[in-house]
Amino acid sequence: MSLPTVLEKIIARKLEEVAERSARVPLAEVEALARSASAPRGFAEALRAQVESKEPAVIAEVKKASPSKGVLREHFVPAEIAKSYEEGGATCLSVLTDVDFFQGSDAYLQEARAACGLPVIRKDFLIDPYQVVEARALGADCVLLIVAALGDAQMLELAATAKEVGLDVLVEVHDGTELERALQLETPLIGINNRNLHTFEVSLETTLDLLPKVPRERLVVTESGILNRADVELMEVSGVYAFLVGEAFMRAEKPGAELRRLFFPN
């Protein structure tokens, strides 16, 4: 299947970005920063502990905007949002660092992580080992690898780099073919994105269809389209307890209160 146009544009921009950033701060410098960064908080471990107790493990997203929806939150203070999520019962945070398409920032990740005790994933479009090392230098505990954006060799190289610098990996898939490729990686975390990259339509059936093909020892995170209690219950009944949710929270006045309402109503 051909790459969706928006993903093509993003990848083209990332190639430029890596060239710009590595010219500004050479890899050796970023590696030194990564070595001196505060210890990883154990992203996969935190999710697993929550899932094993059959409690919702929520990766709550700090996200200002998206290419399809525009600005989601005008009053955007990452530290405030992170604290609100922690109080609301989030297990981990996801912070968008992509500038051009999601109005994210590296600083947002640093501010959010400093404001709470939760493990944080750098949500960006990683195509080069430089960005993985950079994620650790920023203080991230985990990185996202999007199978649709990567070749197999590239994906394996990025996962190996993550392991070297002490980062967990969440590998994201959209269909069965991508899932087969993702299972080459050792990471326990498999993210199933319910949004079709070509049409932007969201269907929770994506998670339910792919679930039987995921080995039991892996931990499935369902991403996109969790909007109400019925969605949460549908997943839990199917044995999925890990969720990545952004938009539903970002549009709420108090993101953490919305998280609690959606996942911990009692």
From Swiss-Prot:
GO terms for biological process: L-tryptophan biosynthetic process. It is an enzyme of class 4 (lyase). It catalyses: 1-(2-carboxyphenylamino)-1-deoxy-D-ribulose 5-phosphate + H(+) = (1S,2R)-1-C-(indol-3-yl)glycerol 3-phosphate + CO2 + H2O. One of its GO terms (molecular function) is phosphoribosylanthranilate isomerase activity. The keyword NAD does not apply. InterPro entries: Aldolase_TIM (IPR013785), Indole-3-glycerol_P_synth (IPR045186), Indole-3-glycerol_P_synth_dom (IPR013798), Indole-3-GlycerolPSynthase_CS (IPR001468), RibuloseP-bd_barrel (IPR011060). Pathway: Amino-acid biosynthesis; L-tryptophan biosynthesis; L-tryptophan from chorismate: step 4/5. Pfam families: IGPS. The keyword Oxidoreductase does not apply. Belongs to the TrpC family. This is Indole-3-glycerol phosphate synthase. It comes from Azotobacter vinelandii (strain DJ / ATCC BAA-1303). The lineage of its organism: Bacteria, Pseudomonadati, Pseudomonadota, Gammaproteobacteria, Pseudomonadales. The gene is trpC.
